[in-house]
Amino acid sequence: MIGRSEMTSALVEELRIWNTPVIGAYLIYRFVKTFAQERPDKRPPDLIMLCLAIAVLSDRRLSNNIRLRRGISSFRRYLEGEKNAVAFDGIHDVVAKTLPYTLAAIDIGLACGIVRVNAESATIEAVDFRARKGTNEIITDAITDDVKIIETLAKWFAKYENSSVVADKLEVLL
């Protein structure tokens, strides 16, 4: 029989690695918000960019090498390394594998009201909301590294016109 503390630590570990779409919804909110803030035209990202970001974030070998100061070109050079190419070769599979998770996270974000769909542009937009005092800190403290990574990806992706350019920069076939 599993003790209570073992169950609690297992649950905390599962949440820490953002294995639930609820945390994914918050990460998508942060990605969409940061992406739009970085764009001169304030345009939100398309679904393909969200799928790429979640796929990169879900693979710890890739996400652990993302740093804002280095930029997307440095990340691409990292991927081109002999050992790292194997990690990135499967990104198409990772995108396909994480698609149900990404869609579930978007669905939860829509249900909670932190993101909305713009039917005219077919994009997902962040909704400004005021969390109760202290709530945001509790959420972000638990997943600080993931928030930094997802915001870095948003800043990188926002520099390019569309998802095809981002995919080309990362040498991903869409």
Over which residues does each language-model region extend?
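Long, compositionally biased intrinsically disordered regions
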Residues: 1-5
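Long, hydrophobic N-terminal alpha-helical segment
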Residues: 6-59
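A glycine-rich, hydrophobic loop/mini-helix early in the fold
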Residues: 45-82
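Helix-adjacent hinge/juxtasegments
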Residues: 76-100
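Basic amphipathic alpha-helical segments that dock to polyanions
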Residues: 102-116
